[in-house]
A protein has these predicted regions:
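Active-site-adjacent core segments of small-molecule enzymes
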Residues: 2-567, 574-582, 586, 591-609, ...
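Catalytic nucleophile loop
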Residues: 500, 617-622, 630-654
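Structural alpha-beta junctions
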Residues: 581-588, 637-641, 657-658
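Short secondary-structure capping/turn micro-motifs that flank functional sites
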Residues: 595-597, 627, 651-652
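A short helix-to-beta-strand connector/capping loop
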Residues: 601, 657-661
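A short, aliphatic-rich alpha-helical micro-motif
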Residues: 612-613
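A charged, well-structured terminal subsegment
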Residues: 660-681
């Protein structure tokens, strides 16, 4: 019998024989050049102090069967570190996935913004984190929820963080209500349920008493809250920001991210099933797209509005975070392209420890007096200190700027820098006057903004904040009939989970001020009636708010299932693969078992572990049986593209022969796949 030491030696020899030394990957572009390049080096197990260990399998004991000895310093060090490996999760946005990328200012904003990274042709490394809001770290990706969309730009002038969501508005107008909102949507404190879900009494109790939430609720109950992929999800800065150019001229802007792959969502049944079948669905999808070279891309744009004294545009208060500016009134101006091209090397070190903050600004970009944004400036900085163990979180590699740092900050928990000199203060003479501040055109300058004349301290909101329903109506009326149906079904589902009938009644009354038909539909589902409301009909509708509007037929990153059996020919499967490869579509062959089919065709997945909700389209490459018929029919119910051999096979599957999205050839199949869903059948 080999001893633990002999086993360790054997494993080491096997590793060296295989040419393996250490799991080194590409260095993080923001690593400090003076720090060790790798977290691990060499091929021997050591302690944290670099001491080589002769046996990593057995504790030190008094005899072979004796008690473990406390003088086993390696055991104590290893267990102690293990006991402290977890840090507090984010209070919100705990569940997330991220990727490195590169941002190129293809169009530039020099005329309105002095930021160097927004000059035409400038390129900046970046790190983007997507997330859900309500759920814990271990919750499912596909829950109905707002999605975070936060990007850190490592620019020559310092880090700039664009900390947004996939919805352009928010639930509340003032940051004072943020803890109340979060407490309401989190699991109820007596039972700690439900997880990652808003379908419960406390959430709807809060929002039904906060009419300002109504616009946001329309978005969250829409398909926007169940995206197909992070790569097919819009992003928004939510708030209004102030840009200034080299001349000091200012503009007000709203940030937009437009995915080049289009804007697409799951359907509700898919979202629910995927939560059990693959709770890591979005995380897995993002990683796979990047690993296979199908890099997600987003166009950054801004809506540019004049910086007027009242900070309004076309009657819309730009300081109200529950309001948007329709793109038909103010088109989005292209700025540049973000390409996510590298997966993190380590989830904890990068995705978990990245610290975003809306106050991480660069010259030319400033915040406004939006009361929710003002509170976020405090909250984001404060929470990092708790979550990351102290004030030195900016020294963590993923958070380090590329720009030189000389901030006079010293000491504190987890101080990684070794500061030299004796003058961590400004001004000084002993250090030659360094570091010093100088307004030389390269430093950050707050744009001068006139304050309200004779302003008094007061706890009030402007009257323009009182309109809580008109934009909710605008959003709902801008949706297609199928999207409106989904909104009504989502409200019915969520409110149906509430125990208190008073909550349901209040929310139905609120919906009556948005759209009478919507309120009546939800009320009927709940077995009640809706009171008459006061609906303000919008002057226009916004086509940009609908996901079913015509979009470019991009299919890159989609997954297609080919259902095969022993009678399936490799020729048929290869015909679909040949058509799919140049389009960036992944084809998965699903068979009755693992291994190969009689034709020698490899099987990627077994039918026993596959479900149609995982795929964007389905091809039946064999005669239908009970399993494949159920598979195809469910995909059809979800309005997906279906490929069959002929009309007889479609009839055998009980599918309408001439239904939209039911195709007979690879060419027709992939053309139909570009429409994402076929809502007209």
């Amino acid at each position: 019998m080999k001893t633990g030491k002999a086993n360790a030696v054997a494993r080491a020899e096997q590793a060296r024989a295989a040419g393996f030394v250490a799991p080194h990957t590409s260095p993080n572009p923001v690593d400090d050049a003076t720090a060790p390049t790798w977290a691990q080096s060499g091929d021997r197990v050591t302690t944290a102090q670099g001491l080589r260990i002769d046996d990593a399998d057995n504790s030190l004991k008094a005899g072979v069967r004796g008690p473990t000895l406390m003088d086993d310093f390696h055991l104590r060090e290893k267990i102690t570190h293990f006991d402290h490996e977890r840090i507090p999760e984010r209070i919100v946005h705990a569940r997330g996935a991220a990727a490195h990328g590169i941002f190129e200012a293809t169009d530039g904003l020099e005329d309105i913004c002095a930021a160097a990274f927004l000059r035409r042709g400038a390129m900046s490394p970046s790190f983007t984190r997507f997330s859900t809001v309500a759920g814990s770290r271990g919750s499912a990706d596909t829950a109905r929820d707002v999605r975070g969309f936060a990007t850190k730009f490592y620019t020559a002038e310092g880090n700039f963080d664009l900390v947004g969501n996939n919805i352009p508005v928010f639930f509340i107008q003032d940051g004072l209500k943020f803890p109340d909102f979060v407490h309401s949507v989190k699991p109820e404190p007596d039972r700690e349920i439900p997880q990652a879900a808003s379908a419960h009494d406390t959430f709807w109790d809060f929002v039904s008493l906060q009419p300002e939430s109504t616009h946001m609720l329309m978005w969250v109950m829409s398909d926007r809250a169940i995206p197909r992929s992070y790569a097919t999800m819009e992003g928004f800065g939510v708030h209004t920001f102030r840009l200034s150019n080299a001349k000091g001229e200012t503009s007000l802007v709203k940030w937009h991210w437009k995915p080049t792959a289009g804007i697409h969502s799951l359907v509700w049944q898919e979202s629910q099933k995927l939560g059990g079948i693959d709770p890591d669905y979005h995380r897995r999808d993002l990683h796979a797209r990047i690993a296979t070279g199908g890099f997600p891309q987003y166009e950054l744009g801004v809506q540019v509005m004049p910086d007027t004294p009242d900070q309004t545009f076309e009657g819309i208060d730009l300081l109200d975070p529950t309001k948007l500016v329709p793109e038909e009134l103010c088109p989005v101006r292209p700025v540049g392209t973000l390409t996510l091209n590298r997966n993190p090397d380590n989830f904890f070190a990068e995705t978990e420890q990245v610290a975003f903050h809306p106050g991480h600004l660069v010259p030319g970009i400033a915040i406004t007096d939006d009361p929710l944004l003002q509170a976020r400036l405090f909250s984001y900085l404060d929470t990092q200190i708790s979550r990351l163990g102290g004030p030195n979180f900016s020294q963590i590699p993923i958070n380090r700027p590329l720009a030189p740092v000389n901030d006079n900050n010293r000491d504190g928990i987890s101080q990684h820098a070794v500061h030299v000199g004796t003058t961590p203060y400004t001004p000084n003479s002993l250090g030659g006057g360094c570091p010093f501040a100088r307004p030389d055109g390269t430093a950050y300058t707050h744009p001068p903004v006139a304050m309200e004349r004779n302003a008094t301290k007061i706890k009030l909101r402007p009257a323009s904040f009182d309109d809580h329903y008109s934009q909710a109506t605008l959003f709902y009326r801008s949706l297609s009939p199928i999207e409106q149906l989904h909104v009504a079904q989502a409200f019915s589902f969520e409110l149906g989970k509430c125990v208190s009938p008073g909550i349901q009644a209040r929310m139905i009354a609120n919906l009556g001020n948005v759209d009478a038909d919507l309120a009546d539909t939800v009320a009927a589902h709940l077995g009640t009636t809706a009171p008459a409301g006061k609906v303000v009909d919008p002057d226009v509708v916004s086509e940009a708010l609908s996901q079913t509007r015509p979009q470019d037929p991009i299919v890159s990153g989609r997954m297609v299932a080919i259902l095969a059996d022993e009678d399936t020919t490799a020729k048929l499967v290869n015909a679909y693969r040949t058509a799919a490869d140049p389009l960036g579509v992944e084809v998965i062959v699903i068979g009755p078992h693992f291994g190969k089919l009689a034709s020698g065709l490899p099987i990627d997945r077994s039918a026993h572990i596959s479900d149609p909700v995982e795929y964007d389209g389905v091809v039946l490459a064999t005669e239908p049986d009970e399993v494949t018929t159920t598979f195809v029919q469910e995909a059809f119910r979800h309005h997906k593209t279906i490929g069959v051999a002929d009309s007889a096979m479609a009839e055998a599957l009980n599918l309408p022969v001439n239904a939209a999205g039911v195709t007979l050839t690879p060419a027709d199949f992939f053309e139909a796949l570009g429409r994402h869903r076929h809502w007209n059948r």
